[in-house]
Amino acid sequence: MSGRGKGGKGLGKGGAKRHRKILRDNIQGITKPAIRRLARRGGVKRISAMIYEETRGVLKTFLEGVIRDAVTYTEHAKRKTVTSLDVVYALKRQGRTLYGFGG
């Protein structure tokens, strides 16, 4: 199995390992106006100031679960790229079926 990278599939020597930037506190990227727009779409007229942090926390918890399941599907298929179908299946597993993305 010489001449193949870490994965064992494909040809080539496999490039140098890149350093991954440590991501922290990216949940603050979900801005106050973005949360406000989502609430407006849901029919909310007025929003309490404490809602924003609470919404970020709930969203982070929800996405962690979906991403964990999607990555599990990806690893089981021995792939390194998470596909839209992985996310669809992860959502379906959690009882939130999503239509329009195949599967």
Swiss-Prot record:
Comp. bias intervals (Gly residues): 1-14
PROSITE patterns named in the record: HISTONE_H4
Binding region for DNA: 17-21
Region of interest: Disordered: 1-20
Residues that bear N6-acetyl-N6-methyllysine: 6, 13
One of the record's GO molecular function terms: structural constituent of chromatin
Chief location category: nucleus
A Pfam family reported for this protein in Swiss-Prot or TrEMBL: CENP-T_C
Identification of the protein by name: Histone H4.1
Post-translational modification: Glutarylation at Lys-92 (H4K91glu) destabilizes nucleosomes by promoting dissociation of the H2A-H2B dimers from nucleosomes.
Subcellular localization(s) per the UniProt record: Nucleus; Chromosome
Function: Core component of nucleosome. Nucleosomes wrap and compact DNA into chromatin, limiting DNA accessibility to the cellular machineries which require DNA as a template. Histones thereby play a central role in transcription regulation, DNA repair, DNA replication and chromosomal stability. DNA accessibility is regulated via a complex set of post-translational modifications of histones, also called histone code, and nucleosome remodeling.
Family assignment from sequence similarity: Belongs to the histone H4 family.
Oligomeric form and interacting partners: The nucleosome is a histone octamer containing two molecules each of H2A, H2B, H3 and H4 assembled in one H3-H4 heterotetramer and two H2A-H2B heterodimers. The octamer wraps approximately 147 bp of DNA.
Record-level GO cellular component terms: nucleosome; nucleus
Keywords noted in UniProt: Acetylation, Chromosome, DNA-binding, Methylation, Nucleosome core, Nucleus
One GO biological process term: nucleosome assembly
Annotated coiled-coil segments of the chain: none
CDD domains in the record: HFD_H4
Modified-residue entries (N6-methyllysine), positions: 6, 9, 13
